[in-house]
């Protein structure tokens, strides 16, 4: 498929929230240990202290290091919103990610969710095929809709992934697409 058709398809996605300013934050400290809720809150408050007053972050996973179990209470206490990353590789890991997201929604509602990204750079790295990513996007969307969450669900990848016609199925499955530059 030609670039123009892919670009037109991507352009047809809704742009109601076309831009977020935030930081990607991992669940591990520099020494490899997992962040505690207090450490998440400290990180969120540091971001708010920047001249840009950053109040949104992106996580890479939900279950690793109890990411959401520790980050969501900190996000709520600091008024930080999260672009939730759900790891899409490895079915067992993906299922654990979904459960961690459901647990966080059950415990804290969904006001802290900006949107949900299923996978990150999977297409660029060729870690998963496009049909698998599309299926997992639809799976997560169905799961969160079943508990009343209306957050957009999509995928983040490099620009080269978005202009590759083989990945059209992912664009079609997504409420939004994100780009790592």
Where is each model-derived feature located?
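Active-site groove signature of glycoside hydrolases
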Residues: 107-129, 156
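Active-site-adjacent beta->alpha loops and helix N-cap segments on the catalytic face
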Residues: 63-75, 124-140
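Aromatic-lined carbohydrate-recognition surfaces of secreted/lumenal glycan-active proteins
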Residues: 144-163
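Aromatic- and acid-rich polysaccharide-binding/catalytic face
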Residues: 114, 120, 157-181
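Fungal secretory targeting signals
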Residues: 1-20
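An active-site-proximal structural segment forming one wall of the substrate-binding cleft
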Residues: 93-115, 136-143, 170
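Loop/turn elements at helix/coil->beta-strand transitions in domains of secreted/extracellular proteins
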Residues: 51-56, 77-82, 109-115, 147-152, ...
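N-terminal carbohydrate-binding/catalytic regions of secreted carbohydrate-active enzymes
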Residues: 20-104
């Amino acid at each position: 498929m030609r670039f123009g058709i892919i670009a037109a398809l991507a352009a047809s996605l809704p742009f109601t929230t076309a831009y977020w300013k935030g930081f990607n934050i991992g669940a591990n400290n520099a020494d490899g240990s997992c962040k505690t809720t207090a450490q998440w809150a400290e990180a969120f408050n540091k971001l708010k202290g920047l001249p840009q007053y950053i109040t949104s972050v992106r996580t890479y996973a939900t279950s690793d290091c109890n990411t959401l179990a520790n980050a969501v209470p900190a996000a709520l206490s600091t008024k930080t919103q999260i672009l939730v990353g759900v790891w899409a590789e490895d079915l067992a890991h993906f299922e654990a990610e979904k459960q961690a997201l459901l647990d966080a929604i059950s415990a804290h509602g969904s006001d802290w969710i900006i949107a949900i990204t299923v996978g990150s750079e999977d297409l660029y790295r060729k870690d998963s095929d496009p049909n698998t990513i599309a299926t997992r996007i639809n799976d997560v969307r169905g799961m969160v809709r079943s508990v009343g969450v209306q957050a957009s669900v999509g995928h983040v990848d490099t620009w080269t992934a978005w202009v590759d016609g083989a990945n059209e199925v992912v664009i079609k499955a997504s409420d939004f697409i994100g780009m790592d530059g």
